[in-house]
């Protein structure tokens, strides 16, 4: 089997800390662990992250932009998610996910999303519960400690880091536009990773 080409050089992935997991590992995430460091941190497999991003890009490109809902409760994900939504034209909810958003058509903020992109299954539990209830596919950024029940596509990544979240959402936006045919090559993607990163 040929090795899949990386979307960005391996050292760029490493610099962003995308592969730095947690000191606690769930059984669900076993297949995505590359190694355990001397300090007890689980390291995620960059090639599996890369592969998941390629699959997610193809999958999300099949949906109309307004059918995609990206959610984030984590503060470091606010900027990446809002920028991602702006670039790909999707809907987004940052901060508190109001109960009933996916299940109660009477709510003014009701969403008829056909697929949901979750930044952290642990933090975004309300969004997860509702997506499961209405039966829409779930793509989730999963760290070493996450449980992955009901997740249709796992993107193994550091879902807590400022830079790692920026890189993940930047790459995903670029993949979606390329798969849609909105850009013919990566050179045409003018946004930078910095555009997606929360500034402190």
From Swiss-Prot:
| MF terms in GO | structural constituent of ribosome
Q: Which organism is it from?
A: Picrophilus torridus (strain ATCC 700027 / DSM 9790 / JCM 10055 / NBRC 100828 / KAW 2/3)
Give TM segment ranges: none
Name of protein: Small ribosomal subunit protein uS2
- A Pfam match is Ribosomal_S2
| GO cellular component terms, A-Z | small ribosomal subunit
Q: Which GO terms describe its biological process?
A: translation
| Keywords assigned | Ribonucleoprotein, Ribosomal protein
Entries under InterPro entries matching the protein: Ribosomal_uS2, Ribosomal_uS2_arc, Ribosomal_uS2_euk/arc, Ribosomal_uS2_flav_dom_sf
Instruction: Spell out the family assignment given in the record's similarity comment.
Output: Belongs to the universal ribosomal protein uS2 family.
Q: Which Gene3D superfamilies match?
A: Glucose-6-phosphate isomerase like protein, domain 1
């Amino acid at each position: 089997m040929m090795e899949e080409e990386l979307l960005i050089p391996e050292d760029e992935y490493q610099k962003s800390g995308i592969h730095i997991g947690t000191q606690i590992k769930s059984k669900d995430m076993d297949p995505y662990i590359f190694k355990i460091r001397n300090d007890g941190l689980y390291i995620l497999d960059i090639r599996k992250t890369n592969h998941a991003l390629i699959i997610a890009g193809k999958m999300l490109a099949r949906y109309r932009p307004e059918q995609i809902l990206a959610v984030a409760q984590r503060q470091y994900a606010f900027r990446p998610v809002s920028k991602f939504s702006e670039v790909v034209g999707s809907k987004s909810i940052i901060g508190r996910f109001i109960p009933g958003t996916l299940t109660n058509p009477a709510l003014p903020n009701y969403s008829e999303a056909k697929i949901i992109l979750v930044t952290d299954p642990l933090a975004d539990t309300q969004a997860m519960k509702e997506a499961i209830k209405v039966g829409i596919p779930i793509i989730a950024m999963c760290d070493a400690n996450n449980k992955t029940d009901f997740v249709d596509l796992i993107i193994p990544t550091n879902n807590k880091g400022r830079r790692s979240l920026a890189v993940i959402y930047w790459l995903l936006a670029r993949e979606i536009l390329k798969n849609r045919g909105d850009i013919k090559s990566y050179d045409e993607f003018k946004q930078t990773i910095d555009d997606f990163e929360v500034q402190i």
